[in-house]
Amino acid sequence: MDMNSANIEEIVKQVLAGMSGNASAASAPAASGSIPKTAHVAMLTALEHYDIKEFPIPEVGDDDILVKVEGCGVCGTDAHEFKRDPFGLIPVALGHEGTGEIVKMGKNVKKDSAGKDVKVGDKVVTCMIFRDDPDITMFDMNKQNVGAADVYGLLPDDDVHLNGWFSDYIFIRKGSTFFNVSD
């Protein structure tokens, strides 16, 4: 399959149709704005093949954030992973250029990675998850070695599953770089 804008558009349409078609009462938010028990994830399960999976939404810990996804771009990296899996991640929830609204957060979450206050209802984006020094690039742009970092949308699948923005919800974990973009 040749990867071009028409192919990507068709893939996105198929994923969105699958997510809409698989909606269940458990994963649909109630009119009161309550958080559903499950979320849908467009999981790349084989080369050039997505399955819409439904997973329980994990409990939000003291340092975690649950975000309702509002949108996500399709990057060339997503297309490369879809076509060739160069990172050996399958199965994987792709999507690393997304944004959404905080619907629940742990009691220890007070500020984003730039020091801006955050609260439920704020719009956020993610960047890297630094395993070593989370401030590696925050204050010195000459320090661009991100070899010890992970990216949502390019994380191996685990027991959380909500690791990419191609989903209803994304689960942002302690140590993640995220920014409040509400303004």
Regions inferred by a protein language model and the residue ranges of each:
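Short Gly/Pro-enriched turn/cap motifs at secondary-structure boundaries
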Residues: 45, 56-57, 89-95, 157-162, ...
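Glycine-rich beta-strand-centered segment in the early N-terminal region that forms part
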Residues: 56-72, 85-138, 182
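Short structural boundary motif marking the start of a folded domain
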Residues: 35-42
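Extracellular beta-rich ligand/substrate-recognition surface
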Residues: 42-50
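Cytochrome P450 core scaffold surrounding the K-helix E-X-X-R motif
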Residues: 77-82
